[in-house]
Amino acid sequence: MFPVLPQSVQAPLIWPQRESMEVSLHSTFRLTCRGQTELSWNGPVFIDDQTNSVKKGLFISTVTISNATAVHTGEYVCSSEPFNSTESTIYIYVPDPQTPFVPSMTPFENHVLTSYDEMEIPCRVTDPSASVSLIHMGTDQVMPSAYDSKRGFIGLFGAGTYVCRALIHGQNHDSIEYIVHGWTGGSDLRVELRAVKRTLLVGETITVDCVAKGSEVLEDHWKYPGKLANRGPKTVKENKLNLEIYYTLTVTNASPKDSGIYACSITDIMSNESQTKELTITVYDHEFVHINPLIGPVETARLDEVPEFKVDIESFPAPKVTWLKDSSVLGDDTAEISTTLLKIGETSYQGVLNLIRAKAEDSGNYTVKAEIGSISTSYSFYLQVKVPPVIVDLIDVHHGSAAGQEVVCTAGGSPFPEVDWDICKNLKHCANDSSQWMPLPINSTDITVELQMNVDNHIESHIIFHHLEGTVAVRCLARNDMGVVSREVKLMSSGPHSELTVAAAVLVLLVIVIISLIVLVIIWKQKPRYEIRWRVIESVSPDGHEYIYVDPMQLPYDSRWEFPRDGLVLGRVLGSGAFGKVVEGTAYGLSRSQPVMKVAVKMLKPTARSSEKQALMSELKIMTHLGPHLNIVNLLGACTKSGPIYIITEYCFYGDLVNYLHKNRDGFLSRHTEKGKKDLDIFGINPADESSRSYVILSLEGKGDYMDMKQADTMQYVPMLEMNEASKYSPIQRSDYDHPPSHRQFNDEAESLLSDDSAEGLTTMDLLSFTYQVARGMEFLASKNCVHRDLAARNVLLSQGKIVKICDFGLARDIMHDNNYVSKGSTFLPVKWMAPESIFDNLYTTLSDVWSYGILLWEIFSLGGTPYPGMVVDSSFYNKIKSGYRMTKPEHASSDVYELMMKCWNSEPEKRPSFHSLSDTVASLLPSGFKRCYERVNHDFLKSDHPAVTRVQCIDNDDAYMGVLYKNQGKMKTRESGFDEQRLSSDSGYIIPLPDLDPLSNEDYSKRNRHSSQTSEESAIDTGSSSSTTKREGETLEDITLLDEMCLDSGDLVEDSFL
């Protein structure tokens, strides 16, 4: 039983009773409608889940939406049936971050305006909280229009493209584009007439399109052969996007009567403007193909020409054209041959064959074939490529045989050449006098001539001399249309060898001797020569790409660096190379605080060449130019007179850094099994505990290995010169300068830094300290415009207190057998440590040293690993460096340290950090007190009586010398970017001395230096004998006075063959 309909129906009620509601994405929501009649729902999508019931006279309808998405956003309408007279609505929002705008079920029709009409742009959002603006794409301006999230933008809009932009949670989202067109006509009208095919066969369909652009209110008129017979229905299609209208005429089952002119006239009704276009259609009753050759039956081409052969083809439809040579199809895959088919007209074509640089083998029969289905036609011609004659071979087959002498001349060419023979009996004039050559008498009984073709299609002419007297010259001539060539051969009668044979043998021996000498000279030149890697920059080109280096031999050398040979005792060899060696020694009288000091002495081997001696002297001069610094191996003195050159430098207790890291690797790994603990130790230091922390960075370390200098106390030493009988040498002691008297006066914190605490072992803080100290040392070298060129862990030494010393150890290293050095020309280079500009452009600067510093960091934090592990220096390695390959982070480096490496490895040198910046960056990774402690140690070093410091002070205080300033020095200082005043305080007063007095003679010098001796020390070095090892009483005080004498001699300059 159905309820009775009331006379007045009220609007149904929707629950929940809201105008709009927001539901979650992918959720389920229900809407319930109650009314007095049957109910129906309408929504943004088809609703298939709807239940209806009747309770207490009320109709109830419920819709359920599962998995709500953006498409469910919209207005839901509940209507009373059957009249739909009343209805209620609710608007549902389903916010979807991925779909900010509601997808439209029907596409937006491009709106066309004749003026500014009010219209609606239906960009509705799924999130009601979104802020939406309308953007005009042409001007990128925001349009002042009101927005309704349930409808979109409504207002007056001009022609253009619009986009709705929604701002949701700080991000912009753009809708699809909405295009609004303005009406135009008259002057913009353009008409085009197109045909799918202009030539057809009987029975095909003719299709002609008349396209009108730029106007919309148009009228079309057609003229064509079948119009009177009412053939050809017309269709109209409008493309509103591009304002184009297509009028299409179609004529089916075409016949030859439909051939003719087809014309289309379009008239703009608004402006009455008209345009007419026409074209010609041809209908054939059968297919056809014909070839009209433009070449003859025989064609010629010269060698290396680019001949072109053409044929005209009349065909309908388009033909398939094939070219053949000697019945073989010529394909497009052959680079020397190209074939093309050009369309000249509707039924006119041209076939073209091109030979790229014609060759002899291109001669042959050519055919062009044109096909249309079962119809085909062809044309053939012969091509001859003309080749100049050539004599392939001319040999004396039976030289001096009993059967006579036979000469064979093999000749080729196209066309085949004719072969003739000439003979010359006066050998002295055959080369210069052509009249001496006469045609060979082939009718003679003593001569036989035969002609034949060989397997290579060459002409062979055989001439046999049955009886030959003396020596004659025979000439073979080959000639054809392209020219003539000839070759000669000398024939000798059988008998003793002529003088020519003897001369040839002597010539061969002479050539062998010359080649041997050249090989020996090349081998001698390729033998590597010793050269100091350090360079001092004199000037820089304006573009910064060319550097001029100071010639070290032009630097002055002050004799106050001289140290008496009899004050120096040599010991064991610390390192030996191809050119020289470094020997441990003890110096007496270098310093007041240390009458006896352990030192390292550089010297050449007895077999050294003059170039090596000059290089060692250059190294000495550069070291005197640099001055002292805590983190370089400082010069203490030199011996350059009355014997070989010795350079006396600081003694480094632990040897080089590579082997020190190898030696302590196991202990380091045992303490750092957990990387997190290591990072905490580096960066998680509690400032409150900092004062009580032991700075092991400068503490005494465990036993070294390579060049281990700690074993010196057990060795027996060799005195350089024999002293008088009363003189005694004391045993060589461990150098006390590593802890000079001035250092012992530090406060407790400094003493903690210099304590000999070997229990701590190698720590991560040590690795950072080494990194910082090397940066400070290189910062100092850069301030002196000095380029190292071989910065690597093997050239970094470690002294007591873990103080890093930068050096150049090339003299005492066998680089020819060291895998770290690669042969390039006559030298060996550390390629894996070199910057790209140094490898490829031979450019060395402070910035190329920065690259090497990055490689050194990798060595330190890999605990002495070899850079680019597993990679061989070859072309592949160089290509990887060019393409930007860089090493991965070493195991024990933090991300900050690795970032520093990558900055050093920037492919653009000017973008690499300076050493000043590098030292500041590394200092920020260390405890705050470390840098203060380092500066205090450095300050006390510069205020101590270290020989390197005191000798420089003597030179600085001497008014008899003036400084040398180099060109562009200010520019190079600027490139080093900010060397602060405090850091330069150690060397700001140091200048390169120039002599203004005549150098003293050796005689005068020997009078001043009462410790000098004329005894040669070569025998002492070579025999290894040792004098007494006890120093006589009172001699130390006399030796100390040497320092005072050095400071008093202001004019002593050393000058010999190497200065």
UniProtKB/Swiss-Prot annotation:
Reactions the enzyme catalyzes: L-tyrosyl-[protein] + ATP = O-phospho-L-tyrosyl-[protein] + ADP + H(+)
Binding site for ATP: 574-582, 602
Segments in the Cytoplasmic topological domain: 525-1059
EC number: 2.7.10.1
Phosphotyrosine, modified sites: 547, 549, 695, 706, 717, 729, 737, 821, 961, 990
Pfam families from the UniProt entry: I-set, Ig_PDGFR_d4, PK_Tyr_Ser-Thr, VEGFR-1-like_Ig-like
Keywords: ATP-binding, Cell membrane, Cell projection, Chemotaxis, Developmental protein, Disulfide bond, Glycoprotein, Golgi apparatus, Immunoglobulin domain, Kinase, Membrane, Nucleotide-binding, Phosphoprotein, Receptor, Repeat, Transferase, Transmembrane, Transmembrane helix, Tyrosine-protein kinase, Ubl conjugation
Ranges annotated as spanning the membrane: 504-524
Regulation of catalytic or functional activity: Present in an inactive conformation in the absence of bound ligand. Binding of pdgfa and/or pdgfb leads to dimerization and activation by autophosphorylation on tyrosine residues.
Disulfide bonds: 33-78, 123-164, 210-264, 409-476
One cellular-component annotation, GO: plasma membrane
GO terms classed as biological process: cardiac muscle progenitor cell migration to the midline involved in heart field formation; cardioblast cell midline fusion; cell migration; cell surface receptor protein tyrosine kinase signaling pathway; cerebellum vasculature development; chemotaxis; embryonic cranial skeleton morphogenesis; embryonic neurocranium morphogenesis
Polar residues composition-biased segments: 1012-1029
Compositionally biased region (Basic and acidic residues): 975-984
Start and end residues of each stretch annotated as Disordered: 975-1036
All residue ranges annotated as the Protein kinase domain in the record: 568-942
Record note on modification: Ubiquitinated, leading to its internalization and degradation.
Enzyme class (EC, first level): transferase
Entry's localization field: Cell membrane; Cell projection, Cilium; Golgi apparatus
Carbohydrate attachment residues: 67, 84, 272, 365, 432, 443
Stated role: Tyrosine-protein kinase that acts as a cell-surface receptor for pdgfa, pdgfb and pdgfc and plays an essential role in the regulation of embryonic development, cell proliferation, survival and chemotaxis. Depending on the context, promotes or inhibits cell proliferation and cell migration. Plays an important role in the differentiation of bone marrow-derived mesenchymal stem cells. Required for normal skeleton development. Required for normal development of the gastrointestinal tract. Plays a role in cell migration and chemotaxis in wound healing.
Subunit structure: Interacts with homodimeric pdgfa, pdgfb and pdgfc, and with heterodimers formed by pdgfa and pdgfb. Monomer in the absence of bound ligand. Interaction with dimeric pdgfa, pdgfb and/or pdgfc leads to receptor dimerization, where both pdgfra homodimers and heterodimers with pdgfrb are observed.
Similarity remark: Belongs to the protein kinase superfamily. Tyr protein kinase family. CSF-1/PDGF receptor subfamily.
UniProt name for this protein: Platelet-derived growth factor receptor alpha
